[in-house]
Regions:
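Terminal alpha-helical segments
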Residues: 1-150
Length: 150
């Protein structure tokens, strides 16, 4: 499967520029910083870390010339596209998908209360993915990589 195969099925073509990717990195950084604040509830910290994860997945799609539509399932699609958009292996994507499922259970069913360990695991996974995105941009799309110091 390629990203082109998903055109019309949740993805559409959309060019990105360096400023847009810089904004993604700024948002990701803020959400990660907030997710580490011990004064915030665990479920809010989990949500913030998940939002950072989603921003990375969306930024990776944008760097490849795509974006999700607003159709149902767009968050899942963005995460499941990570092997093609960022070169992630299937095992890491499955782990990220588990975080998405937990967040959905909490958001839509009030059936998930994250532990401190689960929040920390998600934050670590997102920090790693943020580094992966930066390295991918530097190697594959230096024209979109945020300038040093940003």
């Amino acid at each position: 499967m390629t990203l082109d195969n998903l055109l019309g099925r949740g993805l559409e073509k959309a060019a990105a520029d360096r400023e847009e990717l810089a904004r993604y990195f700024e948002r990701i950084g803020r959400k990660l910083a907030d997710s580490r604040q011990g004064s915030i509830s665990l479920d809010s910290r989990f949500d913030l870390a998940f939002e950072a994860l989603l921003q990375i997945a969306l930024a990776a799609l944008r760097a490849n010339g795509y974006r999700t539509t607003s159709a149902a399932g767009h968050q899942r699609l963005a995460l499941q596209a990570l092997p093609k958009s960022l070169g992630l292996d299937a095992e890491r994507v499955r782990a990220l998908e588990e975080f998405r499922k937990k967040r959905s259970a909490g958001l839509y069913l009030a059936a998930f209360e994250p532990s401190a360990a689960e929040v920390e695991a998600l934050v670590r996974a997102v920090e790693r993915l943020q580094k992966d995105l930066a390295a991918w941009l530097k190697a594959k799309r230096p024209d979109l990589a945020p300038k040093a110091g940003k």
